[in-house]
């Protein structure tokens, strides 16, 4: 890329991981006038993302943004009983607020779907947290992301067809939640292609 570009990364620990998809992109773009701003924090929900990171997100004045959030929102705690950590309506409000704010600042966003998890691994590594994920919840939260992206001029990156070729165990590290290097590579390839397309439009305009 020859034109200066700032890219904001919004997410949770899947994005903040030291070997994550966007760090792969950063390495690939070394030497290009591209600046990445990392606004992803481990354990972050959609509500915490905009409350904690709101000032720094919009001080970045990013040309592009990538949002992948919801893994910590769509989980349940067995003893709650079985309560979602973030209700679906609340999640939708949070995501729509973030995307509307990014859009109003002139940032073009890519929204990636929430990846699958491996419950058996989660139970083995985090037994004391009593966490459980249900596939219908993940699909419902991904539906919110898709609709919000469409409403606010963002591009929805539906990774489901790509992930479907592999089991959750093949996509995640030993904790069952975080994507492994292979899965991050798959995600990086898709995000790169979408960023390229959007950036071509921006520089042509």
Residue ranges and their predicted role:
Residues 4-22, 42-45, 74:
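Catalytic nucleophile-elbow at a beta strand-turn-alpha helix junction centered on a G-D-S/GDSL motif
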Residues 27-32, 48-205:
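Alpha-helical cap/lid subdomain in secreted, periplasmic
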Residues 33-39:
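Short beta-strand elements in bilobed, periplasmic/extracellular small-molecule ligand-binding domains
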Residues 39-42, 115:
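Short, solvent-exposed turn/loop segments enriched in Gly/Ser/Thr/Pro and often Arg
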């Amino acid at each position: 890329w020859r034109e200066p570009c700032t890219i904001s990364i919004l997410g949770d620990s899947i994005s903040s991981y030291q070997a994550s998809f966007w760090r792969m992109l950063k390495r690939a773009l070394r030497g290009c006038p591209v600046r990445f701003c990392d606004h992803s924090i481990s354990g972050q929900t959609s509500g915490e993302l905009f409350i904690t990171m709101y000032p720094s997100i919009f001080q970045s004045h990013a040309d592009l943004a990538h949002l992948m959030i919801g893994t910590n929102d769509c989980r349940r705690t067995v003893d709650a009983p079985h309560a979602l950590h973030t209700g679906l309506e609340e999640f939708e409000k949070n995501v729509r607020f973030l995307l509307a704010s990014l859009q109003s600042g002139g940032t073009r966003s890519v929204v990636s779907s929430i990846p699958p998890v491996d419950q058996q691994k989660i139970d083995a590594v985090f037994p004391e947290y009593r966490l459980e994920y249900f596939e219908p919840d993940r699909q419902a939260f991904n539906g919110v992301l898709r609709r919000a992206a469409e409403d606010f001029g963002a591009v929805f990156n539906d990774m489901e067809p790509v992930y479907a070729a592999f089991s959750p165990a093949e996509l995640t590290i030993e904790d069952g939640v975080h994507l492994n290097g292979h899965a991050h590579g798959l995600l990086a390839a898709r995000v790169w292609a979408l960023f390229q397309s959007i950036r071509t439009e921006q520089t042509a305009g």
